């Protein structure tokens, strides 16, 4: 018997009633991972021994009836530090790295007696939109194994979508939770910048990175955010604002809610069938009592260019620490210190990572800083101001998560610009530090379409309220790929 169709609340009831044990649930989860892993390739590391040991300890002390997550397995993206469990960032550079500490998000999960079942595949150092730049393997879409799962958190998305696990953690720098959530038909949230501690997250773009949850449903997503969100003295960017319960507005109606639909989000480059799906969703929100009106975010068209200058510049600084001296991969053909640095970084980093390091180094270099990095920061401010103007009059922004459904494996990985444009609709949210969610909203050619809801800072409860209202009157979240037992 598999438990992957049961919600977290249903699993909790079974655990409390002792109809199953944490060990049995962990064993079944490990079986689900193994039976599906060859097809989708979600995991880099499955921590079977550690997970079973932790489950046994939880069983020994007993399930806490007041702790919803007690004994629940969790998959963690492989750029989030896990003490004693390989944390590679999907890079040759860290192929053998075992952290000596847990990320705060992981420590928070452990504090709630969640069981880390394994580490999921991703684009190397979270740089990519297809999970094809991983040093270890290419993850495949849960709905069609000839398509990409999205990225960079592709493994975390497919692990949930394929029924390997119920919950997972990812990170989002320019869309890396929302895009794979959309491509795989699951719920993925990028919280407000600072809501979840970045301590223990292997840094890519420090002003953009944010850890967030994946789940099959809106409520389960919010329940996981309840676990990982916290202020943290170990993270200087951690926000002091903490919502007591992110599920508090789920189930409330949305009558009177004002939702903005930016015309730029339905313009050039957006697949016509995606546009139709979003417009149908807008009508559904109106039927639920919300007002949906067209607005403009005029500077969003510069988002991709701004992002790749800022993110690459921050990455070029953050990745300087990987030099072959202290930990990780070291080139064995070096004859002196300079060659250790050069050869290690040349051999240890993949092409996409090296491309972004070079772009960032150029943008920060003397003579080009003002023309690129400084100007990108100024345009970033304009993008933030666009959002501020809209949120002065509206509660949420609605739009597609991605311009297309999942594209084929090996179709865009040799065309960086085309790959970058796939994040056209998600990047502005990171630049502004806002919360955004992707929820299932339909299908095009048998592939899931994601609907994005964006809120002002710290409006996660309102986002969850609207997302849950839409979910309650649609069945897209209930449809599952064949690998999960569905009929698609």
From Swiss-Prot:
The keyword Ligase appears for this protein: yes
Database matches in NCBIfam families: gatA
Any Gene Ontology biological process: translation
The protein's enzyme class: ligase
Protein name: Glutamyl-tRNA(Gln) amidotransferase subunit A
Keyword presence, Signal: no
Domain of life the protein comes from: Bacteria
Lineage, uppermost ranks: Bacteria, Bacillati, Bacillota, Bacilli, Lactobacillales
Active-site residues from the entry: 77 (charge relay system), 152 (charge relay system), 176 (acyl-ester intermediate)
Pfam families (alphabetical): Amidase
Subunit and partners: Heterotrimer of A, B and C subunits.
Entry similarity comment: Belongs to the amidase family. GatA subfamily.
GO-annotated cellular components: glutamyl-tRNA(Gln) amidotransferase complex
The enzyme's E.C. designation: 6.3.5.7
Catalytic activity: L-glutamyl-tRNA(Gln) + L-glutamine + ATP + H2O = L-glutaminyl-tRNA(Gln) + L-glutamate + ADP + phosphate + H(+)
Function description: Allows the formation of correctly charged Gln-tRNA(Gln) through the transamidation of misacylated Glu-tRNA(Gln) in organisms which lack glutaminyl-tRNA synthetase. The reaction takes place in the presence of glutamine and ATP through an activated gamma-phospho-Glu-tRNA(Gln).
Sorted UniProt keywords: ATP-binding, Ligase, Nucleotide-binding, Protein biosynthesis
Any GO molecular function: glutaminyl-tRNA synthase (glutamine-hydrolyzing) activity
